[in-house]
């Protein structure tokens, strides 16, 4: 059956700031306390979406979350009106304010793990929300992510959206950032590659930085998504590269159809894994980047592998890269060698995503890949699909509500909270989502 990959990109939120919240993500730590520009960040993301849509790649948008997220501050014992809660937190425990104001939901590669209908036992598209258990600021995302995805994929005959796994370390799940799908045409059954960093009883794990994904979580997600057991491979990421800042697999590997583009040190037991994939995926091609040409450190600093590998109708592929790749002589030299080598990659497309990159999120972090048949695509909420009208409306919306300068101190400003809620109210109407945010359902949550 004919099917296409639709990229659903996260729209950067109004509180995008640099707080260094993500231990193990070296860009996040390095840019802590810098001044951010939320308006520019949102526009950089929108430009990528629009450019790819104009190039013929189906593209949609996932809206930001409500931030600062007052309900969690109340759970932590802060009381009074919303404004009083903000004031108390800023005075007594400012570190919490940064966590509940993080714009990290923009990295929707961590929103969920997707199983296309060609891979599932019941013939539906399945989406399992990620619990993002390893980081407090990200663990807050799952309930609203679930509401948003249910509003976008609202046809229950075609889509099954599953709640996140229990919030315990044993079941730490980071979503599609640790998941690859390999195969022929998108509408054909594919091989799902789940990548984990640790498992119970196995001492092979990183020592410097945390392994966020467990094998136990990956196995549970595969079950929830009803993936045909014959179409699943579980593989461990190389613990040594996690300790070098590869906190998700999409920082060291990216797949598309029959191609796996990865660093030669990406996986534990990589030789065996690639042999297994060759045996089980027709036409499988591994493009392994040697450490002698691109070190793991350079791969992390440029986000070479946090790229999007997209298929054209003629079978060729385009690699979507952050500007940092072009600015690194060694990485750019390798990429130009790749273009003339015998592989499907025939074009490099570079985007300036500096605002997101400084927090450790490149092109692949910003998108959730969903393979859909034509019938399934028609069942998606049409208001989120990118086109000229939506692009212009979202740009105007960003101009109206987003600040062009934000520091950690600004997060305590009650006006920022009010601006954010008004903006999301307007956006949820623009995208025909209904009342997906807690403040919409609770009348603002003042108490």
Swiss-Prot record:
GO terms for biological process: arginine catabolic process to glutamate; arginine catabolic process to succinate. It is an enzyme of class 3 (hydrolase). The keyword Cytoplasm does not apply. Its EC number is 3.5.3.23. Keywords: Arginine metabolism, Hydrolase. Substrate binds at residues 19-28, 110, 137-138, 212, 250, 359. Belongs to the succinylarginine dihydrolase family. Homodimer. This is N-succinylarginine dihydrolase. It comes from Escherichia coli (strain SMS-3-5 / SECEC). The lineage of its organism: Bacteria, Pseudomonadati, Pseudomonadota, Gammaproteobacteria, Enterobacterales. The gene is astB.
């Amino acid at each position: 059956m004919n099917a296409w990959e639709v990229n659903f990109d996260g729209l950067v939120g109004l509180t995008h700031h640099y707080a260094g919240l993500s231990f193990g993500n070296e860009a996040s730590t390095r840019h802590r306390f810098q001044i951010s520009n939320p308006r520019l960040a949102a526009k950089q993301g929108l430009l990528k979406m629009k450019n790819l849509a104009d190039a013929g790649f189906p593209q949609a948008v996932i809206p930001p979350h409500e931030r600062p997220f007052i309900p969690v501050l109340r759970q932590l014992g802060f009381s009074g009106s919303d404004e009083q809660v903000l004031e108390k937190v800023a005075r007594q425990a400012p570190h919490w304010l940064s966590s509940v104001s993080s714009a990290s939901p923009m990295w929707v590669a961590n929103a969920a793990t997707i199983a296309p209908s060609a891979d599932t036992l019941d013939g539906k598209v399945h989406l399992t929300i990620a619990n993002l258990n390893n980081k407090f600021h990200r663990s807050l995302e799952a309930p609203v992510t679930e509401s948003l995805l249910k509003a976008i994929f609202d046809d229950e005959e075609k889509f099954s959206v599953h709640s996140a796994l229990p919030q315990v370390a044993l079941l730490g799940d980071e979503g599609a950032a640790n998941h690859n799908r390999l195969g022929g045409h998108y509408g054909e059954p594919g091989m799902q590659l789940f990548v984990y960093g640790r498992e119970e009883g196995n001492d092979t794990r990183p020592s410097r930085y945390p392994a966020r994904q467990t094998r136990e979580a990956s196995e549970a997600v595969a079950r929830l998504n009803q993936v045909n057991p014959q179409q699943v491979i579980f593989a461990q990421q190389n613990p040594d590269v996690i300790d070098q800042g590869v906190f998700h697999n999409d920082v060291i590997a990216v797949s598309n159809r029959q191609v796996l583009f990865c660093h030669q040190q990406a996986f534990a037991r990589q030789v065996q894994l690639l042999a297994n994939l060759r045996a089980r995926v027709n036409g499988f091609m591994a493009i392994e980047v040697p450490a002698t040409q691109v070190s793991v450190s350079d791969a992390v600093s440029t986000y070479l592998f946090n790229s999007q590998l997209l298929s054209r109708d003629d079978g060729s592929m385009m690699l979507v890269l952050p500007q940092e790749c072009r600015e690194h002589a060694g990485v750019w030299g390798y990429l130009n060698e790749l273009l003339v080598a015998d592989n499907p990659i025939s074009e490099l497309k570079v985007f300036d995503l500096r605002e997101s990159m400084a927090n450790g999120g490149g092109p692949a972090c910003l998108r959730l890949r969903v393979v859909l048949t034509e019938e399934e695509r028609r069942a998606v909420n049409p208001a989120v699909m990118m086109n000229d009208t939506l692009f212009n409306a979202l740009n105007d919306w960003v101009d109206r509500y987003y600040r062009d300068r934000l520091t950690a101190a600004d997060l305590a400003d009650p006006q920022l909270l009010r601006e954010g809620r008004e903006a999301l109210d307007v956006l949820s109407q623009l995208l025909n989502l209904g009342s997906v945010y807690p403040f919409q359902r609770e009348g603002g949550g003042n108490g």
